A protein has these predicted regions:
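A short, small-residue-rich loop immediately preceding and capping a beta-strand
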Residues: 21-24, 45-47, 65-104, 275-283, ...
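Thiamine diphosphate
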Residues: 100, 107-120, 420-559
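N-terminal cofactor/phosphate-binding cores enriched in small/glycine residues
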Residues: 3-73, 78-88
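Glycine-rich, acidic loop regions that bind phosphate or pyrophosphate groups
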Residues: 101-152, 245-366, 472-473, 480, ...
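Active-site diphosphate/adenylate-binding microenvironment
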Residues: 8-11, 16, 29-30, 34-39, ...
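Glycine-rich, anion-gripping cofactor-binding loops and their flanking helix/strand elements
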Residues: 82, 219-303, 307, 312, ...
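Conformationally flexible catalytic loops at phosphate/diphosphate-handling active centers
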Residues: 148-151, 155-211
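Phosphate/pyrophosphate-binding active-site segments
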Residues: 1-2, 294-413, 514-518, 524, ...
Length: 559
């Protein structure tokens, strides 16, 4: 029987999944439940050593000989510090030493309790990864615990090995052993062992896609030149797979998956026909929160394609596979993914394979139809005078224009509107999603670019970053489309916030400020629009104005 502590059981299960066969264990009460599990699982050989300093070196010696990750398990407090000499040696010898340290709950650190000290950073300089496990009480916390253990063991064994620390807080009572079986835990797996993309990796990834009945490819934010300045790859990929890509993703067009996912969320009876069973994730963050939430709920196994596999993220809470591929190789990888349809000799032509292909085709056609419906809806819908109407008209005008325009969208409402109407690449500070610095980033971009650069920005973001104009550097190729609805309008979309009496003044930051004075003091041409006609004339002027000074169009709306 195993411990009733869920974090200990998750840890034990994953140690087995990652091939740990030896653990050096030290005496102590706080780590006793961990030692019990290691011994009880029947696969890990436990070697009892009393002195923690010696024990850590014992574990390093085992790892040197077996070339496998090896655990040293210690109790809380100074016992962990005693492993430092061996950890430092393992760091410089590149040995996968797994330090598992029991700990008091976080709330009792530095509270004059026995055998306590801040443990997670105690070995910081000499471990590649240090994690402190939660004591899970919800499914999200279970996922977090699983993810942390996976991240630590991945870091310990990734290419050139290194020591790691797994800190395990344990709440009393400590010694209840009534769990019959360890949980079956999800493990991250590298599909490649080399830094460069290999044929073997591609074949394994192709096989995963070929076995899937409902494969999905998600493309998050990417650099503008990720595909060699070509949008061919994503467009071609969309002929064979369902692809979720935004204007920040180098897609070259708007794929209206956010609206489609919201529709499926509102009609859950439709969702099973559209739910993926394997997802490939490329790039960074998605703007669409609704899509992230929906994909996490589907729990379809996912593969992350990343240039930084050591710091692999799990955005869909279902990571199974990791593939190393930098931006330079993405243009090579994309055709290889749909190559499975043109080289069927790689696979057996049995009945199961044909059924899978039939299911994939049906899944693809269903999504094409749904995405087409929402694309037609977006094209046909004529919003009343509002920020949406402004962005739709702006995007229509630059699409019809022969002028080369780089568009920079600020966060919040602006970039979400871009995801509805922009059929080109969009720059946005989406890494942290902050409202500060969007205008400064666009202005800096314009200094080293000869084309027109337009920053579409909301009022709070603009006034927060108005010092972007407080210099003599910016020139006539910077244009600003300011969407001023006198508040942080995006907060009005949050459910139930309107019930709070402070929603407008304290949260939404209602104001009556305009940009006219800011423009006057910073030598920026100023245009104002208060209705549909003025807005359309203003956008035309914004894009066609000739001069050496920046131009700002401030569009006042109620929504």
């Amino acid at each position: 029987m195993y411990s009733n502590k869920e974090n200990i059981n998750i840890l034990t299960s994953l140690l087995l999944e990652w091939g740990v066969t030896d653990a050096v264990v030290c005496p102590g009460s706080r780590n006793a439940a961990i030692v019990h599990n290691l011994n009880d699982c029947g696969t890990i050989r436990c070697h009892p050593i009393t002195d923690e300093r010696s024990a850590a070196f014992y574990a390093m010696g085992i790892a040197l000989n077996t070339k496998r990750p090896t655990v040293v398990c210690v109790t809380s407090g100074s016992a962990l510090l005693n492993t430092a000499p061996a950890v430092a040696e393992a760091y410089y010898q590149h040995v996968p030493l797994i330090v598992v340290a029991a700990d008091r709950p976080q709330q009792w650190i530095d509270q004059l309790d026995g055998q306590t000290l801040p443990q997670p950073d105690a070995l910081n300089r000499f471990v590649r990864r240090s994690v402190s496990l939660p004591e899970p009480r919800t499914e999200e916390e279970r996922w977090y615990c699983n993810r942390l253990v996976n991240e630590a063991l991945h870091a310990a064994t990734f290419r050139q090995p290194a020591p790691v620390l797994i800190n395990v807080p344990i709440t009393e009572p400590l010694f209840t052993f009534d769990v019959a079986e360890l949980p079956k835990e999800r493990r991250f797996r590298m599909l490649d062992s080399e830094a460069a993309l290999t044929n073997t990796t591609v074949e394994v990834l192709q096989q995963e896609l070929y076995q899937a009945k409902r494969p999905l490819i998600v493309v998050g934010q990417m650099a503008a030149d990720s595909f060699g300045c070509s949008v061919f790859d994503i467009n071609e990929l969309s002929k064979h797979f369902v692809v979720f890509a935004e204007p920040l993703s180098n897609s070259g067009e708007t794929i209206h998956f956010d609206e489609a996912v919201r529709h499926l969320t509102a009609h859950p009876e439709l969702s099973p026909d559209y739910t993926p069973d394997y997802t490939i994730y490329i790039g960074d963050t998605l703007v669409s929160k609704a899509t992230r939430r929906w994909l996490r709920q589907t729990q379809a196994p996912s593969c992350l394609i990343t240039a930084d596999p050591l710091h692999a993220s799990d955005p869909l809470m279902s990571l199974r596979h990791i593939v190393t591929c930098d931006n330079a190789n993405l243009a090579l990888l994309m055709p290889m993914l749909y190559d499975i349809y043109t080289h069927c000799d790689l696979h057996t032509n049995d009945e199961v394979a044909w059924r899978n292909e039939e299911s994939r085709t049906m899944f693809l056609n269903k999504w094409k139809s749904l995405l087409s419906q929402w694309a037609n809806h977006a094209a046909a819908y004529e919003p009343e005078y509002s920020q949406m109407a402004v962005v739709k008209y702006f995007e229509k005008l630059i699409e019809e224009s022969a002028v080369c325009v780089n568009t920079h969208y600020a966060n919040s409402t602006a970039v979400r509107l871009a995801c509805i109407y922009a059929n080109h690449y969009v720059w946005c500070n989406r890494g942290v999603n902050g409202i500060e610095g969007s205008l400064s980033t666009a202005a800096g971009f314009s200094l080293t670019d000869h084309d027109l650069n337009v920053c579409i920005i909301g009022d709070l973001s603009f006034f927060y970053d108005q010092n972007a104009l407080w210099n003599n550097c910016v020139g006539g190729n910077l244009r600003i489309l300011l969407l001023n609805n006198s508040c942080g309008g995006i907060f009005k979309q949050l459910p139930n916030l309107h019930r709070s009496p402070v929603a407008d003044t304290f949260v939404g930051a209602s104001h009556t400020t305009t940009a006219q004075g800011i423009c006057a003091q910073n030598n920026v041409e100023y245009i104002a629009a208060h209705n549909q006609e003025e807005m359309q004339h203003g956008i035309s002027a914004l894009l066609t104005h000739k001069g050496n000074s920046p131009v700002l169009l401030e569009v006042f709306t109620d929504a």
